[in-house]
Swiss-Prot record:
This protein's name: Tyrosine--tRNA ligase
EC number from the UniProt entry: 6.1.1.1
Entry's Gene Ontology cellular component terms: cytosol
InterPro entries: aa-tRNA-synth_I_CS, aa-tRNA-synth_Ic, Rossmann-like_a/b/a_fold, S4_RNA-bd, S4_RNA-bd_sf, SYY-like_C, Tyr-tRNA-ligase, Tyr-tRNA-ligase_bac-type
HAMAP family xrefs: Tyr_tRNA_synth_type1 (MF_02006)
Main location: cytoplasm
Family to which this protein belongs: Belongs to the class-I aminoacyl-tRNA synthetase family. TyrS type 1 subfamily.
Subcellular location: Cytoplasm
Enzyme class at the top of the EC tree: ligase
Gene Ontology molecular function: any one: RNA binding
Length: 418
């Protein structure tokens, strides 16, 4: 299957410039292309993964990727479809984020092997030395204000106000494309659908300044079946950095995907063949309660992002927590699996009677409720049911001398730390 057709079949093409010309270019030989990532945080997230994996698919088809991390544009801030001006970060902060993102990208693209090995670039390398006068004379003169104002990303900000700094962002992104074309013969840019205006600024600059044709592919912004986006600005980002989103949390994210999204996400986020995905779809639709599509999705993406061992650990944590087998997990695994649950620091002189602790830790509101819960068998300490009102937590209940896990009912977990 032609790589363009595969991308379409997987739902990875939202918009392109000249589809016929782009198809022809991809058929005739190796195409050099780039995707840009602005360092707006110290980690990329699942929203970025769509473009990253699209870039990897093109590399596997024999084309050459350039991964641009925006050390310069990250200092400015992209206004595209944002309601307000971004907060400007210091150069030291942005430089640190650049290094983090470059490290993450190296997990997905092959930077070492073959004539189409990926190349990492930073646009601070060319913007850091250009003077303001040169910027206006050599770049700015190719963009009319009318053209810049016509971009949807700018139109949406005109009424609320947009600074010249952010207004000029599209010129900077356009110049990225121009530089990569001149230095590396890059003729294709890949990015999110919200970047269309900035990306076509690059094709316009190429046409006007160098009389060359550039191509653009935008990938869709991913939403669930209800139309809800996931990403940093929506406050529900699933980060690629395991310190920000653990492999277990990422595993749970995919396991909780709605049935209506599961097969579509298999096409977008995994390298399973379309035939394999079709087989999974048939099995999934025959027995949706078994959640086969979600299980495969969780396995494939967690393994892709964090490695097979992290996937196995996430699966084990899931199975042990579901069964209530707390003692089968290490403290490291428990911290990963119970991140975000209520945590209470037990004081050295605090009475460790179970009823007293249930109240002082905030697990229940009163001693009466605590006594009822214990007597009714609703309280578990490290997976063991406690029904003795006089039970006192001892050192034996401190897992690795660090924490105790309390469960109330079937699913409400609490962690006591010492």
């Amino acid at each position: 299957m032609h790589i363009f057709d595969e991308l379409k079949e997987r739902g990875l093409i939202f918009q392109t410039t000249d589809e016929e010309a782009l198809r022809k270019a991809l058929e005739e030989g190796q195409v050099s292309y780039y995707t840009g990532y602005d360092p707006t945080a110290d980690s990329l997230h699942l929203g970025h993964l769509v473009a990253i994996l699209t870039s990897r698919r093109l590399q596997l088809a024999g084309h050459k990727p350039y991964a641009l991390v925006g050390g310069a544009t990250g200092l400015i801030g992209d206004p595209s479809f944002k309601d307000a001006e971004r907060s400007l970060q210091t150069k030291d902060t942005v430089d640190g984020w650049v290094k983090s993102i470059q490290g993450q990208l190296s997990r997905f693209l092959d930077f070492e092997n073959g004539e189409n090995k990926a190349v990492m670039v930073n646009n601070y390398d060319w913007f850091g030395s250009i003077s303001f006068i040169d910027f206006l004379r050599d770049i700015g003169k190719y963009f009319t204000v009318n053209y810049m104002m016509s971009k949807e990303s700018v139109k949406k900000r005109i009424e609320t106000g947009i600074s010249y700094t952010e207004f000029a962002y599209q010129i900077m992104q356009g110049y990225d494309f121009f530089v990569l074309n001149q230095d590396h013969n890059v003729t294709l840019q890949i990015g999110g659908s919200d970047q269309w205006g900035n990306m076509t600024a690059g094709t316009e600059l190429l046409r006007r300044k160098a009389d060359k044709t550039g191509h653009v592919i935008t990938v869709p912004l991913i939403t669930d079946a209800t139309g809800k986006k996931f990403g940093k600005s929506e406050g529900n980002a699933v980060w690629l950095n395991p310190e920000k989103t653990s492999p277990y949390e990422m595993y749970q994210f995919w396991m909780n995907v709605m049935d209506a999204d599961a097969v579509r996400f298999l096409k977008i986020f995994t390298f399973l063949s379309l035939d394999e995905i079709e087989d999974i779809r048939k099995q999934f639709e025959a027995a949706p309660h078994e959640r086969l599509a979600q299980k495969v999705l969780a396995r494939e993406v967690v393994t892709l992002v964090h490695g097979e061992e992290a996937y196995k650990e996430a699966l084990n944590i899931t199975e042990q927590l579901f069964a209530g087998n707390i003692k089968n997990l290490s403290v490291k695994e428990l911290k990963q699996g119970l991140r975000g649950v209520p945590n209470y620091q037990v004081q050295a002189d605090e009475h460790n009677n179970i009823v007293e602790l249930l109240v002082s830790s905030g697990i229940v509101n009163s001693k009466r409720q605590a006594r009822e819960d214990v007597q009714n068998g609703a309280i578990y300490v490290n997976g063991d049911r406690i029904q003795d009102l006089d039970y006192v937590l001892s050192d034996a209940d401190k897992l690795e001398n660090e924490l105790t896990v309390i469960r109330r009912g079937k699913k409400k977990y609490f962690v006591l730390t010492y």
